[in-house]
Structures are given as C-alpha cells and as structure tokens.
Amino acid sequence: MKTNSIICGNSIEEIKNIDSESVHLILSDIPYGISLDTWDILHNNTNSSLLGTSPAQKKSSVFKKRGKPLNGWSEADKNMPIEYYNWCSTWAEEWLRVLKPGASCFVFAGRRFSHRCICAMEDAGFIFKDMIAWEKDAAAHRAQNVKVVFERRGDNENATKWKGWKLGNLRPLFEPILWFMKPYPIGGTLTDNIRLHSVGGYNEEYFKNNPLNNSGIEVCSNIIKCKTSQDDRGLHPAQKPVALMEFLINLTTVEGQVILDPFCGCGSTLVAAQNLNREYIGIELNPEYCKIISERLEEKTKA
C-alpha cells in the first residue's frame, strides 16, 4: 500500500491491504467503548445504566444517542467488557501481521476496558510491554451530588447524612497508553532485531532532552505530562495533542520509517508523523474526518 495516504473506509477490512511486516510503529487512539459518541458504542446493550441516571439525563439528547440509561442496573452491562474484548479481537491479529518483528504499538485505551484490550492483543500474539500514563492538565468531571438527589426526593434525613458524598468517578487526569511489541525471532536478541529490522529499542537520549520528560521524576519515567493546547481542540471529541504523538513517534522510530494509525480520527498521528519526516498510513471510517485530516496535512505542507 502507498504510504503518506489516508484511506477512508472500515479499518478492519482496509488493513488487510497493507503488506505484512511493512510498518515500523502503530500509534492509535482507538474507540474506548464507553459510548462517548455513536462511533464509540461497541456493545449490544442499549440500556446501559451502570452508574444510575437522573431526570436531567433522561431528557438529554446525548444520553439518548448513546443508548443510555432508563432504569438502574441492567444485566446487559455485565457483557460490555467481553464485547469490547471481542471487538478488539477483530483487528488485533491484522495489526500484528503488518508490524515488523520487534516493532512497538501504542494504544490509547479507556481506563474501564483497557484490560480487555490487553487480553485481546496478547491473545493475538503481542507482548504487553508497559503502560504509560499520560498526565493531562485538565479533564471534564461530572459527579452527582448525593445530598441534592435526596433533597429532591424530600428525604432530608439522608440528605444530611450523606452531605459531601458524590456518585461517579474521580477526575480522570490520566489516560493509559498501552505499549505492546511484536515478538522478535526466537533465538535472537533485541539488539539483533534492531540490526535486522531497525526497531526494538527506545531513544533514551531523545527522552532525556524532551520537555515532556517530568522534572523531579526519574529520567525515562512512564508518566508523561503533556498539556492540550488550543490547537489540539475542537476537531474531534477524543482529539489528542500532536506533541504527545510526536513524543511517542520519536521515542521508538527514526526518520523515513512507516507509522500506521488504523483509527485516525482527525489525524493527529498523521500530522505528527509528517512533522517528523516519517511515512504514514491512516485509516478513518468517517468521510468528514478524512476531509479534516487532508486539510490539516495540506496546511502543514504549505507552512
């Protein structure tokens, strides 16, 4: 397949057209399966209400779009993690096939189901190398006030008893980046693999000199701080900072190598690859996002 290209289509099918062992790095912000939008609903449960609901949520169009809650706990909620595992299994083997031996694969995954992604990729043949924590500078946080709920019900006794308590999660100020590696030939070493395939290590010198390396924390920490700039907002609901993608690309590849993003959204991975003189292949299902990607890459070329 031609590099420096954007394929508008179904990733699970289109990746079959990529040559085996032709990619040096896969870097992708895959759907998290948490019903962020219609493209992120990867389960058959249309009445998911794991954390309960409120009258305001019932009226909200976003909850209707997500197939979200109508009544308390649903038995179908229990199937969502395994359904996410099954979805990851539909593409994991193809990812393994197209990567060079010893090549890295970085996957942005949601905290709730990341373990299912790990299992699917291990079952496909990947080695789970590490989990990097991306520490964000800000994150939306919605937690229902228990006291207010009881007050609306006219239950003042429990409203007083549970003052200060919330429903929901803590503020999500980190996101997991799962680091996988394609196994290298048995009997050899990673150093042998670097000589043969030019992948398998990480660039410590780059890491030490990069501003994302945490001051005050041991060099080459697996906690990465990266702020989201204004340029990294507004194109996609799950948009990631270009600087973060550049960091991961520089960490594991050299100029001229091929970067693949099978779920490229608004194209931040491809923009980062272009900035760093890497070849790239991006696959995206939504034609509107494919247009945005083309415009971003063209704008960078003109600049």
What residue spans do the PLM features occupy?
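Core catalytic lobe of class I
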Residues: K2-K302
